[in-house]
Amino acid sequence: MSSNALTILTAFALAFAALSTVLVGAYGGRRARTTSDFLVASRAVGPRWNAAAISGEYLSAASFLGVAGLVAKYGADALWYPVGFTAGYLGLLLFVSAPLRRSGAYTVPDFAEFRLGSTRLRTVAMLVVVVICVFYLVPQYQGAGLTLKILLGLPVWIGPVAVGTIVIANVVGGGMRSITFVQAFQYWLKLTAIAVPALALLALFLSDRAELGGPLPPSVQQQTTVTIDTNVVVQVAEPAGITVSGTVNDRAVNNATLPAPGRYTLGEGTTLTLAAGAATPVVAGAPNTGREWISSGGGLGGEHPLYQVLSIIVATFLGTMGLPHVLVRFYTNPDGRAARRTALAVIALLAAFYLFPTLLGVFARLYVPQLLITGTADAAVLLLPNAAIGGVVGAGLAALVAAGAIAAFLATSSGLLVSIAGALSTDVLRGRIRDFRLAAVVGGVVPIPLALAASSLELSRSVGLAFAVAASTLCPLLVLGIWWRGLTSGGAISGLLVGGGLSGVATTLAVIGGVDDGMLAGWPATLIGYPAAITVPLAFLTMIVVSRLTASTAPPDVAGIFARMHVPERLGMGIERLPRDSP
């Protein structure tokens, strides 16, 4: 298939995904009239429908593109991301979902005020919610820019603007009621879009003799040319078949060969030509040989791999319990029992999905290894079907993947924007429907420049940092607020400030470029890139210690509050907390 025909087919698939999102959102939001409709879909969403919607919004750019990219680049240690993303719902199922729904709250800040009776705590929680959602929106917009650039050759800024516009239109039109339909539909679209190519490539792999765990990096199957967009350091295991034009180790070369294995710095604009069968250079910090890639313990680039893995587990498992756009969906269930059933169903849906990006990451290393040269492995899922299969079938699979990628950005962005709008409209503005819509517009626009600034950060790493902030703030607030009677507003505020401040600073530094990897044996760079293993325990400890010191300020009716959260609804203790309806 010609490149023009492929571009047209891909553009059609992207347009289909975007248009179907708008139409499904309009259908879902056609009856949205009240504040309850916009914030919690009138608490009338059943477990199966809600589970599909939660899975649809949770499977973000990091899940659809980033997991496969990390597996292709780093191998076995990258599997902790999908494991943690899924296992986090076990924590939600056991500790949070039912008590949170029984509280009657409609946002996380509202739960904070319900539990501890502090408007100051509510304000701090609102700020934390907005920060987490903005940090999480950044990789969604970032992934949209990458997708349109790779598939259609469009400027990077068009992706964030297009996704932002569509999401704002959906959220403004019907709030939670609208995006519930959108997200449930998009889960099945994403599952189809990633499962069909993965199974097709699995059939190709089973008939292939390619080796994953060999002593060399993967080799290209045909002559391949790679252009370096930014300066990069690569590790060359076997220089045979590689010629370079441009800048190597700050020296200008023209159609030169590399003299020996080793590390080389390639300057911007440098072109590498790999003959068919040549071993691919690999970006420094990633596993070089097949044996290194298939073995665990190497981490995800940089120093201190064991700490990296531990921090990833903490961030993904506990961060899920602190994601505002996930938590708010449990407010839409009719009762606590339905919330628990929803969380259980989500675990099954996510487990089914994450099998396929893992497979695609393995196949990407075999069939598009040239991505390992620049380290831009997030593009692997987008390029893999056409590169490995080719022809009409490959083009069709590539278009299907493109539709799924756009669905991933739109679904997650919709949930995040509802959380931002709900927090701002009820805690900063007057809680009217028009305030919700205004907050949605502002919340959708602000992350666009941040996404453009963070374009060099891998998608799963970007999302992992947002998880670290959530795990360091709202997770301790919810776990201690639901299960420990001794929590006070002073302790909660102190923990939010300590956990949020430290993880927020680390995330900001990581987005703008971090620090030198060689400083102090690599610890500053590692702590900035993976802060959760430090910031989460500090947040819990701060809340407990300060609460002990301020025990006299604990709410006097804590027994009644706990009864409301933990006693089944059929005993009649529940009270719904919703702002007054107004246009």
Model region roles, listed by residue range:
Residues 1-583:
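Membrane-embedded helix-loop-helix hairpins and adjacent transmembrane boundary segments
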